[in-house]
Amino acid sequence: IKLGEMLTNPERVGVHSLYVFSSNPAITAPNQNVVRKGLMRNDLFTIVHERFFTDTCKYADIILPATTSVEHDDIYNSYGHYTIGTGYKLIDPVGESRSNWQVIAELAKRMGLEDAFFNLSERELIEQIVHTSSRISKRDQELILNGEPVEMTVPENYKMDFKTPSGKIELYNPQ
C-alpha cells in the first residue's frame, strides 16, 4: 500500500499515529500531494525523528533529535552498488539525540513488547544481521564487522524485470 493512500483513503484510514525516521515522505514518497494531504489530518499524530529539519517535520506534532552517523553503531549498504559496511560510534550523542534503534527499542519496551530482540545493543544487532545472512561468507562477515566495506556479488540468476519495451530502465519513452 502506498503511504498517501494509506493516510487518505476513507476505507483504509486506520492509521492515527505515524513515526517517521530516516525518511522524508513529504517530498520523496510517490504522489506527494496526497501524502501531504494525509500528513495534514487533524486526527493523525506524527512524530519525526531526524537529524535535519525536513519538509516532513513541518507536519509533525513532535520532532525528536536523531544521532548522526558518528554517534551510533550502524550497518550500511550503498545506493546503486552492492557494498556493505559498518560505521562505529566515535562520539557520544550530542544533547538529547538518540539513534533510531534506541528510540525503536524504547518504544517497544514501553508498549509491553518483551521480545529479547529489543534488548540487543546496536553492535549486537549488527552482528546478528551479519552472522545470519546466508549471502555473506564467514570471511566477509569478519571484514564487515571489523569496519571494512565488502563488495557483494550479484547472484548469476539475478535479473531486473522492467516493464518497458527494452526491458531496461527508460528515462524517456517515445511512445
Task: Report each predicted region and the residues it spans.
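Long, low-complexity segments enriched in small/aliphatic residues
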Residues: I1, R123-Q175
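Non-catalytic alpha/beta scaffold blocks inside enzyme catalytic domains
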Residues: I1-I136
